[in-house]
Amino acid sequence: MAGEASDLTPGRRSCPLPAIRRSARQLRWPSVPMAKRRSISLRCSKENVGPVRCAVRLREGEASFAEFDLPRKSQQAIMPLDKLGIADALSLKITEIGFENHVPSVWSAGVPFLLIPVHDVGAAQRVEFDPQLWEKIVPFVDGALASAYVYCRGGVNHVAKFHARMFASGMGIVEDPATGAAAAALSGAIRHFDRLTDGHHPIMIEQGLEMGRPSFIHLHIDVDGGAISNARIGGQAVRLASGTLDL
């Protein structure tokens, strides 16, 4: 691993979205090349949600891995939700919405998401998102249209504890393959509905399989006194292409 050091650098956007609305890979991607260029494995990035501590693991011949602390803990926004309308917007039966004691709910760790539990992986794979129906039933949270984060327990891959899909018509995104902000929001729902005991809880979330762009988000939740004391998300970053932009 590269020598330990620290760095405070303003985050750089890689897409035309507000800086707060970024996925795990959009924080991982700048962090990994910066770490390689500067030979550091620990840096702090200035984001709109606050300073974000990011640790990077660099190993020759392996995909680089980046992990960062959540600057904000996930909080629930209590509001009435139209379960039938949600099912219609996802092209699912109302009986396919929810599993165990998980029900649709709104959570945010800086970006609001309407988290929608579905019965199983098959139901998640059958989702056909209708943005027009969604915009009719989805609530506004902090002045923003909540995005849809569909999740279920288990996964296609045996290492995954949850399978997820994210749709954000309000941001011009049909579907996203790896959404760190949504995984951050999900941490609160998991602690709430699964009643996590005190201790450390590592959780693997698979996303993007339906798009042919499989991603694995590592979510770590530390619980103390029945509440989240700390949470981290991370994953691997693989260079697929590179280029330069002249301004």
What are these regions (language model features)?
Residues 1-18, 23-247:
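Active-site proximal loop and beta-alpha junction motif in alpha/beta enzyme cores
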